[in-house]
Curated annotation (Swiss-Prot):
Signal peptide: none annotated. Residues 324-343 are annotated as: Disordered. It comes from Mus musculus (Mouse). The lineage of its organism: Eukaryota, Metazoa, Chordata, Craniata, Vertebrata. Residues 215-244 form the IQ domain. Residues 325-336 have a biased composition (Basic residues). InterPro entries: Leu-rich_rpt (IPR001611), Leu-rich_rpt_4 (IPR025875), LRR-IQ_domain_protein (IPR052859), LRR_dom_sf (IPR032675). Gene3D superfamilies: Ribonuclease Inhibitor. The gene is Lrriq3. Residues 556-617 form a coiled coil. This is Leucine-rich repeat and IQ domain-containing protein 3. Keywords: Coiled coil, Leucine-rich repeat, Repeat. Residues 132-179 form the LRRCT domain.
């Protein structure tokens, strides 16, 4: 394994060229790199890792991090425990737009001016610079916090509002370096972590920082309160209006609803009309379905036409591809239950629109309808279908074969001797008379249609007036019930307050009794404790005296034993001295005897030698023999 940078000879070798190309292609897809404690000196090989998101180069010998400029997608960068002394310029850090966590602790940074380039990181949340020389300088934290705006946590503490807002004194909980703001921004590295684990760890750290700020930042707490107030204020009309829409039901014809509103109230009505799609119906009137309505919507009869410009009901008479058309609005789930409730109402709020074929109208009727539209009558219903633009031809009556045969025979026999002018005049007269009768009949039909139309409009108006009257009546009843309910609520609340007061009075009385009992118990406990203290002191004194007596007796016994031992030692010494003297005398006697014996032996030897010299050394022969004398002489 190669430590540090790979040499140029190895990378530029011909046999390694294809291998290097493959490595470069693979490095483009790297998202996670971890080289911790490998004694690396450079990171030039990371220039091609354009997809890198998590980079861990801790505990190495790096001095330059410029090769990371191409890694634009970095989220976490761990460079702690290296030998970095200077950081790249602001352009380098502005390119890392996704960088959220940066670990630079335990490096050689010494100048605050060099660290201020980190202000180019637009999304940096966590930064560590402890155990660096620059962290010992005065104002180090103030400079970093106010130069890197998105920063939320520095070293071991989350940034407080007191560090950002000048001259703002906060309670102990929100102060700088308070225990509530402490957070371990750099957890210990775990061996064998994957990219997913690192991403989870990053998310956990960021969420934990945000949670600490949300609970310990006065600015964020006030902002949360204001946002909640604004949202509640914005939604309060909806919740207030929603309370009145409870239970009154009417039946309407199951058709498509077309509502063109001119104000916000029209949108509100559209939201509260629920229509259920009907099954396949061809040429028949659809079933009746239920629908919620509010009495407030029919409050004013004159303004009803202004709020809703068009409520047209189109019967479903076409069946396309065997499927019915779906309405825009969703189905209300409780419609069947509402139908059963609406049938039991005291007031009948139903009305029906009869389905009939459209009669034939002349051009006069069309003009009359146009005139009515120009006059803009209030009772002219907009949901009726318009008159047909073209006049339909009357049906032609065909003669039978027998009549045609008779006519041909008559013309063949009587044509030559008979003139037909009179018959032509008669036929013309009858045809004109028939035409006049047809026109009169059509005019009568048109008049009857107009009369029925007016009657229908009058009936509709009466129905609407009845509905408005009934809705007003229902509103009055609802108001009465609401007032009664409010009065009942106030009564219950007053009764509840009285009960609470009684409970409070009872509680205070019990509290006083408990306080008296507690004071009595405390006094008894104090007296008992004093008595116990006296008893314990007396017992302690007795015990102390008994211990003293026992110690005195022990001392006397030990002194007597020691004296007895000393006497024994003296006697033993005397006996030993006597024995030693006896032994010494015996030894002296033995030594003297031995010395005397040896002296005697020496004397005997000397005498023998003298005698020998006298006897043998007188003559010369003896002198010659003296040379061969034994050694023991």
């Amino acid at each position: 394994m190669f430590h540090g940078t790979i040499t140029k000879e190895l990378t530029s070798h011909e046999e390694w060229s294809h291998y290097n190309e493959n490595i470069i292609e693979d490095q483009k897809d790297f998202v996670f790199v971890k080289y911790s404690g490998l004694h690396l000196k450079s990171m030039e090989n990371l220039q091609t890792c354009i997809s890198l998101r998590v980079c861990i180069f801790s505990n190495n010998f790096l001095t330059d991090i410029q090769p990371l400029q191409s890694c634009k997608k970095l989220i976490k960068l761990d460079l702690h425990g290296n030998q970095i002394k200077t950081l790249p310029d602001k352009n380098f850090w502005s390119g890392l737009k996704n960088l959220k966590l940066l670990y630079l602790h335990d490096n050689g940074f010494s100048k605050l001016k060099n660290i201020c380039v980190l202000s180019g990181c637009v999304s940096l949340i966590g930064l560590t610079m402890f155990d660096c020389p620059v962290s010992l300088k005065k104002g180090y934290r103030h400079v970093l916090v106010n130069s890197i705006w998105p920063l939320k946590a520095l070293d071991h503490h989350v940034i407080s509002d007191e560090e950002i807002i000048q001259n703002w004194r906060l309670p102990e909980r929100f102060k700088t370096f308070s225990p509530s703001l402490f957070f371990n921004l750099y957890p210990a590295l775990i061996k064998g972590t994957t990219y997913e684990d690192e991403i989870k760890n990053i998310k956990h750290i960021i969420s934990r920082i945000n949670e600490i700020l949300a609970h310990n930042s006065p600015v964020l707490i006030i902002q949360r309160w204001i946002r909640g107030f604004i949202v509640r204020k914005h939604l309060s009309p909806y919740f207030k209006h929603k309370k009145h829409y409870h239970g009154k039901m009417i039946r309407v014809l199951e058709t498509k609803l077309i509502c063109i509103g001119r104000s916000d109230e029209d949108k509100y009505l559209e939201d509260f009309f629920f229509i259920k799609p009907e099954c396949n119906i061809k040429g028949k009137v659809a079933h009746w379905k239920q629908m919620r309505y509010s009495p407030a919507d029919f409050k004013y009869s004159t303004e009803y036409g202004k709020h809703i410009s068009c409520l047209s009901y189109e019967l479903k008479t076409k069946y396309i591809d065997g499927k019915s058309k779906q309405p825009r609005h969703h189905i209300h789930k409780g419609q069947k239950a509402m139908k059963a409730e609406s049938e039991d109402e005291e007031v009948d709020t139903e009305f029906r629109i009869s389905a009939m074929k459209i009669p034939l109208y002349s051009s006069r009727s069309l003009k009359y309808g146009a005139m009515l539209k120009e006059m803009k009558w209030d009772y002219f219903p907009q949901y009726l279908q318009p008159f047909p633009a073209t006049r339909q031809k009357p049906p032609v009556k065909r003669e039978t074969l027998w009549k045609l045969k008779k006519r041909r025979e008559f013309l063949a026999t009587q044509r030559a001797g008979m003139k037909l002018h009179m018959f032509d005049d008669v036929d013309k007269y009858y045809s004109e008379q028939k035409q006049h009768e047809e026109e009169a009949r059509k005019f009568a039909a048109m008049v009857t249609a107009q009369v029925t139309q007016e009657r229908a409009s009058v009936n509709i108006r009466e129905k609407l007036n009845k509905k408005i009257y009934m809705t007003r009546k229902l509103m009055e009843k609802d108001n009465e019930t609401i007032q009664k309910g409010l009065q009942q609520i106030w009564r219950e609340r007053l009764a509840y307050l009285e009960k609470v007061r009684e409970r409070k009075f009872m509680f205070l009385a019990e509290k006083k009794l408990n306080a008296a009992d507690q004071s009595l118990v405390i006094s008894l406990n104090n007296e008992r404790s004093i008595l116990l203290k006296g008893i314990t002191q007396v017992e302690r004194l007795k015990k102390h005296m008994s211990e003293k007596k026992a110690k005195h007796l022990d001392v006397i016994e030990k002194w007597e034993e020691q004296k007895y031992k000393q006497d024994l030692l003296m006697e033993m010494k005397k006996l030993r001295v006597e024995e030693i003297q006896k032994r010494h005398c015996e030894e002296k006697f033995v030594i003297d005897t031995l010395i005397l014996q040896k002296g005697y032996e020496r004397l005997e030897e000397a005498k023998a030698k003298v005698e020998y010299i006298k006897t043998f050394y007188t003559s010369k022969s003896h002198k010659r023999r003296n040379e061969a004398m034994p050694d023991h002489i």
